[in-house]
Amino acid sequence: MPMFIVNTNVPRSSVPEGLLSELTQQLAQATGKPAQYIAVHVVPDQLMTFSGSSDPCALCSLHSIGKIGGAQNRTYSKLLCGLLADRLRISPDRIYINYYDMNAANVGWNGSTFA
C-alpha cells in the first residue's frame, strides 16, 4: 500500500504528463510491491518556502506497510529526489521526504484493513 505524497510550489502547468504513472512504476520496482497497491498524490501550486526562498521545493511523504528503514530509505531518497529533480526541476537539496512504516491494522482498504 505504498502512498507517496508530494506537496510542491511548482505550478500545475509544469507537472509533466505521465509523472504519476512513472512514480507508480518506479516505486513498485523499488519497494517490490505491486503497482496496483501504490497511490501517488502530487499537490502542485502550494504556497511554500524552503530555506526562506520560494524557489521550487517539495515536502514529501512515503507511507508503506514494511519496506521502510535506513538503507531502503536512502535508496528511495536517491530515486525520488532524482525523479523530482529531472521531471519538476526541483533541486534535491530543496526536497524533504518523511518515511512512515505503517501498521497493517491501521491502514484501511476495500472495506477492511491490510491486517
Curated annotation (Swiss-Prot):
Gene3D superfamilies: Macrophage Migration Inhibitory Factor
Residues where N6-acetyllysine is found: K78
MF GO annotations: cytokine activity; dopachrome isomerase activity; phenylpyruvate tautomerase activity
Annotated EC: 5.3.2.1, 5.3.3.12
Disulfide bonds listed in the record: none
Enzyme class: isomerase
Keywords: Acetylation, Cytokine, Cytoplasm, Immunity, Inflammatory response, Innate immunity, Isomerase, Secreted
Transmembrane segments: none
Annotated catalysed reactions: 3-phenylpyruvate = enol-phenylpyruvate; L-dopachrome = 5,6-dihydroxyindole-2-carboxylate
Entry coiled-coil feature ranges: none
Positions of modified residues (N6-succinyllysine): K78
Listed PROSITE patterns: MIF
Location of the protein in the cell: Secreted; Cytoplasm
Superkingdom in the source lineage: Eukaryota
Protein's job: Pro-inflammatory cytokine involved in the innate immune response to bacterial pathogens. The expression of MIF at sites of inflammation suggests a role as mediator in regulating the function of macrophages in host defense. Counteracts the anti-inflammatory activity of glucocorticoids. Has phenylpyruvate tautomerase and dopachrome tautomerase activity (in vitro), but the physiological substrate is not known. It is not clear whether the tautomerase activity has any physiological relevance, and whether it is important for cytokine activity.
The protein's assembly and partners: Homotrimer. Interacts with CXCR2 extracellular domain. Interacts with the CD74 extracellular domain, USO1, COPS5 and BNIPL.
Family to which the UniProt record says this protein belongs: Belongs to the MIF family.
Designated name of the protein: Macrophage migration inhibitory factor
Source organism of the structure: Meriones unguiculatus (Mongolian jird)
